[in-house]
Amino acid sequence: MNIKQCNLLFALHARMIPVKCNFKNSYSDLTCPVCNDSNHQDSQLHILQCKTLLNGENILVKKQISYNDIYSCDVTKQSTVVQLFENLLSKRRRIENERKTAE
């Protein structure tokens, strides 16, 4: 893993990535801003499950990835889940920016 990925892994461990559930006191509505489904809270786990981010694909099953891999002692598992988070967070930022631009 590179330094950027190590920093992301630390942020995931410490629940510091920018999702509403990590900063509950700052938000009255914890709904995912990407899928806007009131049944899904904006959490780290939901990022790996959000149908809008995944485009309907079940990447977790395909790559045999688990959210708990961020806490694993297996560096390969950690690296795989961090790379997936990197891609999904990047896609999330892109979607949020496109929506802001469209407003």
Description of each model-found segment:
Residues 1-103:
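Family-specific functional microsites
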